[in-house]
């Protein structure tokens, strides 16, 4: 028995009470509203003497009762995006100024992937690191609830597919880089003994070289848990299998190499489109057995947002007691001058909202851009038994990532669900994908006329027969119609939009395109759709397809 299993046993004991609490749905239904008001009050109290806190009278707000606190806060602080915080952040990061948005000096800034805009620098305070640590413990607490033995899990290795841990440090001692670079150095003994790929490989910023080094470091290891985006797990799985076979091992699947792999923790992108390929790598069949357990997260550079608390459920429970306060802006109102925002107990199931956060690192009513829907909502403040469960939400897109060139009103979730359904119906093993509009054009001497439409570009492991591709296209189109009445209308009776176009590229095309953009790595996501053709044309050009 490995001595690190004792760490798992100790962690299991330490988390026993929290594990029970994670499973108490009635507790989270009853108390989420109060917990969230408490987080807001604590945030305002801590930041009351900062420049931002003084100018927005946080000290006065902290003296209000729970019923008036939120209304007062909303009156004092407007919802805003990064540009509104940029001057403050520049002073804190470049000038080393203290007590600006949050008490003291912020010594770490997470550089975001910039999926909807240019790079942003998100403050990461000591309190935020503690918040993230607490949420990380909740991952293990929920894993126990899902049937994982921490004793058994921590007997082997835990593999993290994160970004580079290399940081740029300025003259004020302030470090900027991937969030991985801020968190990984905090891994201490004894967890450091089971952590893969190790700090030397974690420092690497050349992602193809990093995947190669990671595969070589873990091909002979007893990997029992993997944390990362599924798209990069697949790249690693493929290389690990190649190395194992080259070394003479009769490995047909990842299960042959890592038979004790028990838990995949994933987040950042929707898992369903990658499910069949993960199963194929694990068991040899796209409809075969899966890794024993999967657990989905909703992490962000701004703070941890939600964790899956029910096996197999798409709804993720809001981290309502982690020193962050969440509000939700109706998607159709997000561009208003003063958009309305609702606390977790004020939302309605099935409506789309843009996430707005107030964090323990000094972002106040900050619009992060993700679009979510709630499957369950908690009791309203002071109104028992009015909710349907803990605050559980699903990520359905980005408020700047949509397709509405012809009134079709498609969002990321529609595209992801349609790709997953079509892949499942045809048995295709897909990689990355994206979609964009096809603009109509009149016939010319050089080209025929073209109707308005939609193009989806996707990766596949090999050749696809015309019949199979036509079947994929038909299911993809049908699934979009099922989800979206506007798309159905535009596709009915020749009212404007032609059937979708599917362009198939070889595996690796998207990562080559991302590398050309300087966006390759475990912290960067391929955009799933856009209301322009930049992504579609860019990845096709990178693959040499006109």
Positions of the model-derived regions?
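Amphipathic alpha-helical segments in well-structured domains
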Residues: 129, 133-137, 176, 412, ...
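Conserved AMP-binding loop of ANL adenylate-forming enzymes
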Residues: 143-190, 201-204
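Conserved helicase ATPase motor motifs in RecA-like P-loop NTPase domains
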Residues: 110-116
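Short small-residue beta-strand/loop micro-motif enriched in glycine and branched aliphatics
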Residues: 118-122, 402-405
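Amphipathic alpha-helical surface "interface" segments used
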Residues: 62-75, 156-163, 497-503
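Active-site glycine/GP-rich loop and adjacent strand/helix microenvironment
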Residues: 1-58, 94-95, 184-546
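Active-site diphosphate/adenylate-binding microenvironment
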Residues: 34, 38-42, 46-109, 121-127, ...
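Short, basic alpha-helical nucleic acid-contact segments in DNA-binding proteins
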Residues: 135-143, 304, 312
